[in-house]
Swiss-Prot record:
This is Involucrin. Residues 76-89, 473-493 have a biased composition (Low complexity). Keratinocytes of epidermis and other stratified squamous epithelia. The gene is IVL. Residues 228-240 have a biased composition (Polar residues). It comes from Saguinus oedipus. Residues 1-47, 60-123, 139-493 are annotated as: Disordered. It is found in: Cytoplasm. Pfam families: Involucrin, Involucrin_N.
Length: 493
């Protein structure tokens, strides 16, 4: 017996593919494989077959063959192609499911439409909100702009006043220079003394310069602002400024007149000068130049101090503006309260009118109650002996009725107020009043008949007094009023 040697045999790729194709696929994928034939796998690629893990592993071990001459890089390039094929396969499955389930497709379409509608609504709401925000911002910007303009108006007015004051100071510098020159001339020209009129004018100029100093002006402005705060009106501030400007203009005119007088005096002095004083003008010019520098420095220092005072003054004015705004808000609140008071006064007038109307309605109702009570008592007066006592009793009851009606008025008034709300009920109430007036006239006639002489009964005769019941269609008085009547009767007895 010759020994048989078994050698491992490697099958080619075509045979391994045939063996794999013989395996039946699952039930769900049979139709798809019939419609679309599976493409041939490239070399070095595992065939995707849905088989148990054990079977696949066995077949892979037996039938995996390596193709010679194919590098590994080509296999790596073939992997993305496999992914694309799988995606196409999934898309085909989805289309097939959509064709089988049209209801789900319709539901999905509805959901998408609803999402689109909601997105459109959200966008519209966002647009509206943006517009509202823009409008509110624009309004706030306008309000801030108006407030800034109002605040800026005051500094502008103050700047104008400062310029005006600077001009006045420039005009005042000339008289000061002239004073220095005059003093120098007095020292150099002892025989040429100035007349007494010039000295009086110089003193007058010094007195005028003192009230024009800025600190005193600021005090006057502060007093003026305090008066304006009491009035709390901006237009009145502007009215006070023209008066102040008129005063300044008057002072400037007066200064100009004084300048003219000084020029006239200088001209006279020039005529009185001796020929030896020809060299004096140059000396005077040098002195004037020397005097200008310290005066300029002093003017600058004063100007700086004035600016600092003005800055403080602006801060005070801003606080005043805030205070004025608060006062305006308080005024608006007071106006609202006044409107509410007027409304309350109108309501009080209406209540008074209702009370008057109720007072007019009380009389016929009292008469109705009295007439019913008198009718009951007249029916009881069947016997002549009882008439005298009952007449007295009637008088007492009338007095009691007046008291009880006053006590029961609050409840009665409330009922009347409810009745007054309906005009139809008022008309119905007026009809029985007319009937009551006729009944009262009949009662007065019956009372006159009762006042006639009464015959006394026999001594042994006994009379039975019964309480008369009200006739049909009439109602007795309330229990509370009857009790009050009995109490009043006991007090009178």
């Amino acid at each position: 017996m010759s020994q048989q040697h078994t050698l491992p045999v490697t099958l080619p790729a075509a045979l391994s593919q045939k063996l794999l194709d013989t395996v039946p696929p699952p039930v769900n994928t049979q139709q798809e494989q019939r419609k679309q034939p599976a493409p041939l796998p490239p070399p070095c690629q595992k065939v995707p077959v849905e088989l148990p893990v054990e079977v696949l592993s066995k077949h892979e071990e037996k039938h995996m063959t390596i193709v010679k001459g194919v590098p590994e890089q080509e296999c790596e390039q073939q992997q993305p192609q496999e992914q694309e094929l799988q995606q196409q396969h999934w898309e085909q499955d989805k289309e097939h499911q959509k064709a089988e389930n049209p209801e789900q497709q319709l539901k999905q379409e509805k959901v998408q439409r609803e999402k689109q509608q909601l997105q459109g609504q959200l966008e519209e709401e966002k647009k509206l909100l943006d517009q509202q925000l823009d409008q509110e911002l624009a309004k706030r910007d306008e309000q801030l702009g108006t407030k800034k303009e109002q605040l800026l108006e005051f500094p502008e007015q103050q700047e104008g006043q400062l310029k005006h004051l600077e001009q006045e100071e420039g005009h005042l510098e000339l008289p000061e220079q002239q004073e220095g020159q005059l003093k120098n001339l007095e020292h150099q020209e002892k025989p040429l003394e100035l007349p007494e009129q010039q000295e009086g004018q110089l003193k007058h100029l010094e007195q005028q310069e003192k009230p024009l100093e800025l600190p005193e002006q600021q005090e006057g402005q502060l007093k003026h602002l305090e008066q304006q705060e009491g009035q709390s009106e901006l237009p009145e501030q502007q009215r006070g400024q023209p008066k102040y400007l008129e005063q300044e203009e008057g002072q400037l005119k007066h200064l100009e007149e004084q300048k003219g007088q000084l020029k006239h005096l200088e001209h006279e002095e020039g005529q009185l000068e001796l020929p030896e004083q020809v060299g004096q003008p140059k000396h005077l010019e040098q002195l004037e130049k020397q005097l200008e520098h310290p005066e300029q420095q002093e003017g600058q220092l004063k100007h700086l101090e004035e600016e600092e005072g003005q800055v403080k003054h602006l801060g005070e004015q801003e606080e005043q503006l805030k205070h004025l705004e608060q006062q305006e808000e308080q005024l608006k609140h007071l106006e609202q309260q006044e409107g509410q008071l007027e409304h309350l006064e109108q309501q009080e007038g209406q209540l008074k009118h209702l009370e008057q109307h109720e007072g007019q309605l009380e009389l016929p109702e009292q008469q109705v109650g009295q007439s019913k009570h008198l009718e009951q008592e007249e029916k009881q007066l069947e016997h002549p002996e009882q008439q005298e006592g009952q007449l007295k009793h009637l008088g007492k009851q009338k007095a009691q009725l007046e008291l009880t009606e006053q006590v029961g008025q609050p409840k009665h008034l409330e009922q009347q107020e409810k009745q007054l709300e309906h005009p139809q009920q008022q008309e119905e109430q007026l009809k029985p009043q007319e009937q009551q007036e006729g009944q009262l006239k009949d009662l007065e006639q019956q009372e006159r008949q009762l006042e006639q002489p009464v015959f006394a009964s026999a001594p042994g005769q006994v009379q039975d007094i019964q309480q008369a019941l009200p006739p049909k269609g009439e109602v007795l008085l309330p229990v509370e009023q009857q009790q009050q009547k009995q109490e009043v009767q006991g007090q009178h007895e």
